[in-house]
Swiss-Prot record:
GO terms for biological process: DNA replication, removal of RNA primer; mismatch repair. One of its GO terms (cellular component) is cytoplasm. It holds the Pfam family RNase_HII. The lineage of its organism: Bacteria, Pseudomonadati, Pseudomonadota, Alphaproteobacteria, Hyphomicrobiales. Its EC number is 3.1.26.4. GO terms for molecular function: manganese ion binding; RNA binding; RNA-DNA hybrid ribonuclease activity. Endonuclease that specifically degrades the RNA of RNA-DNA hybrids. This is Ribonuclease HII.
Amino acid sequence: MKRSASDSPLLFDLPLAPDFSQEQQLMKRGLKHIAGIDEAGRGPLAGPVVAAAVVLDQNDLPEGLDDSKRLTAARREALYEIILTKAITVSVASLSARSIDASDIRKAALEAMRRAVIGLTLKPCHALVDGRDVPPGLPCPGSALVKGDQRSVSIAAASIVAKVTRDRMMIRAGAAHPPYGLEIHAGYATQKHRAAIESEGPVPGLHRYTFAPIKGCFDC
């Protein structure tokens, strides 16, 4: 299906910071509660993929929301607490490395998103999803927004919640598995992480055995 220009924004089309205009367009159609959905952890060699769904209060929007990748860790942590306080409802879901290996990362990420929406205490009227895919099986209609975390404050809020949640999980994993430095790189393929995998081997249940360079290098 051909994508519209709004689905694939050019860099100069993006706002300086995400705003509430995407949500307002839906609200003009009578849709009251709009959920933003995003995930963290598609690319790492280790750990889960984590998705978050957030329904913001249009009358009490947190200030400073942005794509989590454009924020410092300290700023993400501060906004995370503000989002949990101000949002109407927030839900987080994750799929483990084993679940990722059993299917693939795209399917796992979409399933985590679906579960996050289902976990909301209030059923949204519509979901705005970061990326190009709407997860199958959502309990509400959804729209995919390319670079949505830079266009929609609801998606930006979800990106922050997902990122902070996953980073905290990887800090705990790092304490349990010191040689890998997971608390530093969150499971991504840094030189330190790759060297530790080569010397120590991958950890079952933690590392993604279907991801290169792990795939085919070890007896799993």
